Design a protein with these regions (language model features):
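Structured mid-to-C-terminal alpha-helical surface segments
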Residues: 1-185
Length: 185
């Protein structure tokens, strides 16, 4: 199931964008269970407190890693990087969730495939699909995207079980000689 929202980004009010929100109604097996989280709204016109049910952060971001590696979109890279920075997640627990949800779907992704797909993402912009979605006060430029790429690579991709992609070293060296001299340094 999905919902589509149309909006104008803050940076360009003349443009209309569509944001598709996908709701996964097929996966019902949680690896770490459901938790309650406090939620509070406090603004001029409404105040409320509630407990909301959700998954552990590692579980949510494990599916985010799966999305990053299964789709051509790069906005998941931003989300993973911010989650790793802000939520003090356990990367090994996140990878366990990633593996769990891949197994449920019957579509495993090895470390070699993960490395190949990540490096292929460098053939196009890492920022173009996220930039219009961010508020004006959040910057995510090409340098930020490369930091995010390196963080996700070292904290998550390198932890996926299996052998590295046999061409990773060669592709990284070529990219360092070309357009990305500081790649994964």
């Amino acid at each position: 199931m999905h919902l589509v929202f149309k909006f104008s980004p803050e940076a360009d009010l003349e443009t209309m964008l569509k944001l598709k929100v996908e709701i996964n109604t097929r996966e019902h097996e949680s690896l770490y269970g459901i938790r309650q989280y406090p939620f509070e709204i406090d603004c001029r016109w409404h105040q409320a407190k509630a407990e909301i049910l959700s998954f552990e952060p590692e579980e949510l971001f494990g599916t985010k890693l799966r999305a990053l590696l299964q789709r051509r979109k790069n906005r998941d890279l931003f989300d993973l990087h911010e989650g790793l920075k802000q939520l003090s997640m356990d990367p090994d627990k996140l990878i366990a969730c990633f593996v769990h949800y891949l197994a449920l779907g019957g579509k495993p992704i090895s470390r070699a495939v993960a490395e190949q797909r990540m490096l292929e993402k460098l053939d196009r912009s890492l920022t173009e699909d996220i930039a219009p979605l961010l508020p004006a006060y959040i910057q995510f430029n090409d340098d930020d995207a490369m930091d995010a790429f390196g963080n996700v690579w070292s904290e998550l991709i390198a932890r996926i079980k299996g052998d590295p992609w046999k061409l990773s070293g060669q592709v990284i060296d070529e990219l360092r000689k070309g357009k990305i001299p500081n790649l994964l340094r």
